[in-house]
């Protein structure tokens, strides 16, 4: 798994986990605003970006690989923040390896499985070739609130995502339920959701918050499914507060 690390080696470590269909570059606006407040660890998840050569297989396998990254780069633990698919992985890491997670920021994690995942995945498989078309990638980028300066990154990486990675990652995403260990996580946890996200996502945030006593929840006004890209200023400020 490709991992980018930068920032002050003596600063508190932060592991940032991107969403599906994008890559570590989605955190660039946040990093620009975070400055030297953190030592940032940014992987490209399997099947994405610079890790496109590795097929995404499952959340469990990816969480184990991320735990190995933390064992090597932040053995005393790190603040873990994830968006969408990356937010699901954040809850999984917190549940299974709380010794490596000093705090969790869970942004827009779906925590209620879809009723008919097979139908969704069938349609997705049929539409997969469209991801390699620039016009379609541009439409998707708009839905994901990708800013103009990151559009080329999105178009490039969309074409790199294999059908196997697409189906595996989305399949895991739409079947996801909160791991049992999440309710026992003892370190600080913040759940975030956009005020304009779908009802499913807002309810998922309530579930995630409700399942963990002592967690906090923020609904961000004016935001859809794209808080780190829509409000990188706010997101960087929140990360700095969690350190």
Roles of regions detected by a PLM:
Residues 29, 39-81, 237:
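Active-site loop/oxyanion-hole signature of alpha/beta-hydrolase fold enzymes
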């Amino acid at each position: 798994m490709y991992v980018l690390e930068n920032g002050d080696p003596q600063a508190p470590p932060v592991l940032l986990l991107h969403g599906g269909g994008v890559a570590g570059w989605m955190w660039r606006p946040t990093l620009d605003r975070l400055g030297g407040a953190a030592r940032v660890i940014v992987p490209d998840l399997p099947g994405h970006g610079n890790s496109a050569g590795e097929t995404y297989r499952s959340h469990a396998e990816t969480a184990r690989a991320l735990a190995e990254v933390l064992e090597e780069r932040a053995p005393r633990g790190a603040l873990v923040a994830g968006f969408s698919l990356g937010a699901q992985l954040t809850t999984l890491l917190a549940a299974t390896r709380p010794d490596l997670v000093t705090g969790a920021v869970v942004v827009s994690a779906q925590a209620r499985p879809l009723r008919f995942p097979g139908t969704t995945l069938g349609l997705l498989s049929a539409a997969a070739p469209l991801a390699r078309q620039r016009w379609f990638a541009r439409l998707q980028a708009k839905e994901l609130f990708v800013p103009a300066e990151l559009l080329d990154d999105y178009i490039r990486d969309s074409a790199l995502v294999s059908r196997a990675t697409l189906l595996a990652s989305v399949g895991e995403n739409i079947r996801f339920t909160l791991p049992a260990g999440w309710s026992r996580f003892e370190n600080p946890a913040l759940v975030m959701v956009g005020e304009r996200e779908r009802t499913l996502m807002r309810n998922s945030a309530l579930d995630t918050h409700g399942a963990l006593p002592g967690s906090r929840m923020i609904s961000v006004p004016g935001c859809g499914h794209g808080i780190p890209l829509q409000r990188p200023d706010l997101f960087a400020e929140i990360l700095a507060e969690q350190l």
